[in-house]
Amino acid sequence: MVKQQTADRLANPDYIDAPFISNHDTTRISAQCVNNEEQMKFAAGLMMMMPGSPFVYYGEELGMKSSGTKDENKRLPMYWSAQDLSKTPDAPQAADAVEQKFPSAEEQEKDPGSILQ
């Protein structure tokens, strides 16, 4: 990894890496870690320690999950409150209802041990 970053910086001195765990084209980390909260926190911690400007795909900080291979399931609306945990009118029409294991942002803000905190 260091070798690649050194080569990138030599090719472009203004190079800034942009590490990420997942995005709209990939499965969310919660699925990769099978909803294991400690593994998800560890992955996020590693990403934040990498050089560059890390990108957090919306919902990663809550443990939001996607399911299947449909793009629409990777673009579900952010769930700010418990009311948002079911499929909302803002969800893409072809999206499946995806059960979320972790609480909403509103609920996680109150829990000092949550993924968000």
Where on the chain are the PLM-derived regions?
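Loop/helix patches that line or flank the sugar-binding groove of alpha-linked glycan CAZymes
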Residues: 2-3, 14, 28, 34-117
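Aromatic-lined glycan-binding groove of carbohydrate-active enzymes
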Residues: 2-24
